[in-house]
Amino acid sequence: MKNVMKLSVIALLTAAAVPAMAGKTEPYTQSGTNAREMLQEQAIHWISVDQIKQSLEGKAPINVSFDIDDTVMLFSSPCFYHGQQKFSPGKHDYLKNQDFWNEVNAGCDKYSIPKQIAIDLINMHQARGDQVYFFTGRTAGKVDGVTPILEKTFNIKNMHPVEFMGSRERTTKYNKTPAIISHKVSIHYGDSDDDVLAAKEAGVRGIRLMRAANSTYQPMPTLGGYGEEVLINSSY
């Protein structure tokens, strides 16, 4: 009798534990994915802010540079969308229109949203004593309203003027390479292929940030396409 009772208790306990370890109740109809597979699906060198910090431990302060649009600013897209609608609806000719650059660089970025990952990165670098620079592929406007906005937004301790590389003459293949070299940058952060390739051309460490899926800057680049490090959770 005692043995029967013991078996009954064990059976009840086992049944109670089943829901906690239960599998899917219905077979999936689509391939789908999960959080781990999303990170493991492709051979990408993912890296975190903490890992970057660890890689710099014991090293003297360095110079680091950031692209602006889609890298430190989550949503500068409205400025470009407005510019396209105003100066060349349905076309990209507005990017060659100096009136557009005068307008967007004069202060449109005050409507942009900073990326949290950029705030975390910049805070980490400034805590180390690193110097922060901003390089952009934009063409310079008559007034630089970008520098003071970035200085305030990211609480930059020793702000350097933004380098507008879009219209500068160069002997390099990529437009940010001269700035990376002249400012002795050790790490360059950016979302575009040109950012990654400019870092490679300059011979420095390039780390890619993810571009937000709803950015107007299309097509989307391939993360890890050049074997570069990619900052995890960096689309926002």
Curated annotation (Swiss-Prot):
Its EC number is 3.1.3.2. The active site is at D67, D69. It is an enzyme of class 3 (hydrolase). Binds 1 Mg(2+) ion per subunit. It comes from the Bacteria. GO terms for molecular function: acid phosphatase activity; metal ion binding. Residues 1-22 form the signal peptide. Mg(2+) binds at D67, D69, D191. The keyword Transferase does not apply. GO terms for cellular component: outer membrane-bounded periplasmic space. Its cofactor is Mg(2+). Substrate binds at T136, G137, K176. It is found in: Periplasm. Keywords: Hydrolase, Magnesium, Metal-binding, Periplasm, Signal. Belongs to the class B bacterial acid phosphatase family. Dephosphorylates several organic phosphate monoesters. Also has a phosphotransferase activity catalyzing the transfer of low-energy phosphate groups from organic phosphate monoesters to free hydroxyl groups of various organic compounds. Homotetramer. This is Class B acid phosphatase.
